[in-house]
UniProtKB/Swiss-Prot annotation:
Region (Disordered): 56-87, 99-133
Start-end of Polar residues biased regions: 118-133
Name of protein: NOI-like protein
Sequence similarity: Belongs to the RIN4 family.
Organism: Elaeis oleifera
UniProt feature, compositional bias: Basic and acidic residues: 56-75
Source taxonomy: Eukaryota, Viridiplantae, Streptophyta, Embryophyta, Tracheophyta
Basic residues composition-biased segments: 76-86
Length: 228
């Protein structure tokens, strides 16, 4: 079996010769106090290990970009100067050019044209106003006519409804009187038909008359419903 590693006591570390304690003591021997430890796995401390381009190439690229930008700026500036100079020359040429002479007859023609236009506009406004004045009474008359027609229709509907209601009540009263007569006729039936043949004939004729009255009332109701 392998022997376990010898672990020194806490107080005997300086006296005994232990390999790992010696290694830890000599790690920072070459570095002075306060120096920063270099970490090769940090991209900020070791950018060349993580990016393909070197620092020198980045510096050259930035200088080239600056030179190209300055060159473009000068080209654009020269182009704008040429453009402004051309505009200034055209403006001076326009100011110094002679003005065309206008005869007094042209002014008279313009004044007459303006007066004709003013007269035409005044005539159109007066005609529009006259047409609007004529349209207003016609519109009011049309509104009154529509109102009268509406009132006439409502009166006719009310009258027709009232007459229909009166006829219905009259027919219902006739039917109720006929029913009451039939009820009173039942009270006239004798107890023995063989003992009073005369009264039975009278009762039979009375029943026939009641049937006729019922038929007449039913006919009137049917005619009234058909008329509605």
């Amino acid at each position: 079996m392998a022997q376990p590693a010898h672990v020194p006591k806490f107080g005997n570390w300086d006296g005994e010769n232990i390999s790992y304690t010696t290694y830890f003591e000599t790690v920072h021997r070459d570095k002075g106090d306060g120096s920063k430890i270099f970490n090769p796995n940090d991209p900020e401390e070791n950018p060349q290990a993580f990016y393909p381009r070197t620092v020198a190439q980045d510096h050259q690229h930035s200088e080239k970009h600056h030179n190209d930008t300055s060159t473009d700026y000068h080209v654009v500036k020269q182009h704008r100067r040429k453009h402004h100079r051309r505009e200034d020359r055209e403006f001076h040429r326009y100011v110094e050019a002679p003005r065309p002479h206008r005869s007094p007859f042209q002014g008279v023609d313009m004044d007459s044209h303006r007066s004709r236009n003013h007269g035409t506009s005044a005539t159109m406004s007066s005609s529009v106003k006259r047409n609007s004045d004529n349209w207003l009474p016609q519109h009011q008359h049309h509104r009154r006519t529509n109102k009268d027609l509406a009132e006439g229709k409502s009166w006719l509907f009310t009258t027709t409804t009232a007459s229909s209601y009166t006829k219905s009540r009259k027919l219902s009263r006739e039917c109720s009187s006929t029913t009451q007569s039939s009820i009173s006729a039942k009270n006239l039936v004798p107890g023995d038909e063989t003992r009073s043949p005369i009264s039975w004939r009278v009762f039979q004729s009375y029943l026939t008359k009641l049937k006729e009255q019922k038929q007449i009332a039913a006919t009137k109701i049917g005619q009234h419903l058909n008329l509605r």
